[in-house]
Amino acid sequence: MAITAAQVKELRDRTGAGMMDCKKALTETAGDIELAIDNMRKSGAAKAAKKAGNIAAEGTILIKNGEGYAALLEVNCQTDFVAKDSNFLAFANEVLDVAAASKVTIEDLKAQFEETRVALVAKIGENINVRRVEYIDGANLAQYRHGERIGVVVTGEADEETLKHVAMHVAASKPEYVNPSDVPAEVVEKEKALQIEIAMNEGKPAEIAEKMVIGRMKKFTGEVSLTGQAYIMEPKKTVGEVLKEKGASVSNFIRLEVGEGIERKEEDFAAEVAAQIAATKA
């Protein structure tokens, strides 16, 4: 049976697959479009399963405001080339729209978009993962994206420009907490024990070591907290001092960066080539 251009176009419109893939699928099913779609879906699922073990540590961070909150989403792929692909970005934005509409959990997002994800993996040829979504509440929100890789949302009592600048600071300086007093007790105790050991190893008398540790702990809690950090736009002042001068405050922030916490496989090119040569001789 001859496959017509109209059949190929219909299958392509319905699946988003390439023209040659559509023609091949139709040829294999003697022009049965519905069967071709089923076969392509099965093939896509098989390809996605094979790609599932591949590390996806590239991708994008997207932000969108909802009603009284903002959603931050990370979607991963394997290469920065695909991270710029229009199909990948369209998929990520589609997921974001659903997330921002009603604070959908990451588990529900994964389930809702699994079929679409599988089809995209088959089309693009890389593992794709809807990794995480975070929500931040606030009537006064400011967001900042540094390229595609870093996204920040800050909420507080301040004008839009001030909050935007603070969001830029968060992107650059990576604070973990809002205020020094927010650093959890267990984190403080762990660092304190480390600093005591360091001071004692330096041969300092106990009373001097204790004073040194107090100073170092103040520095530590300042460095890991937003208001205790030196402000990137006025390094001689802390963020807290700048906010106080403006009669402003920050109550919360979220910072996401593509791939953070993902263990990346170190590629040994020489070893890879050697393995390929060995395989040809086997």
UniProtKB/Swiss-Prot annotation:
PROSITE patterns: EF_TS_1, EF_TS_2
Keyword Protein biosynthesis: yes
Chain segments carrying region Involved in Mg(2+) ion dislocation from EF-Tu: 79-82
Localization in the cell: Cytoplasm
InterPro entries: EF-Ts_dimer_sf, Transl_elong_EFTs/EF1B, Transl_elong_EFTs/EF1B_dimer, Transl_elong_Ts_CS, UBA-like_sf
Single GO molecular function: translation elongation factor activity
Entry keywords, A to Z: Cytoplasm, Elongation factor, Protein biosynthesis
Superkingdom: Bacteria
GO cellular component: cytoplasm
Broad class of the protein's primary localization: cytoplasm
Pfam families: EF_TS (PF00889)
Xref: Gene3D superfamilies: 1.10.286.20, DNA helicase RuvA subunit, C-terminal domain, Elongation factor Ts, dimerisation domain
Described purpose of this protein according to its UniProt entry: Associates with the EF-Tu.GDP complex and induces the exchange of GDP to GTP. It remains bound to the aminoacyl-tRNA.EF-Tu.GTP complex up to the GTP hydrolysis stage on the ribosome.
PANTHER family, per database record: ELONGATION FACTOR TS, ELONGATION FACTOR TS, MITOCHONDRIAL
Family: Belongs to the EF-Ts family.
Protein name: Elongation factor Ts
Protein source organism: Shewanella woodyi (strain ATCC 51908 / MS32)
GN (gene name): tsf
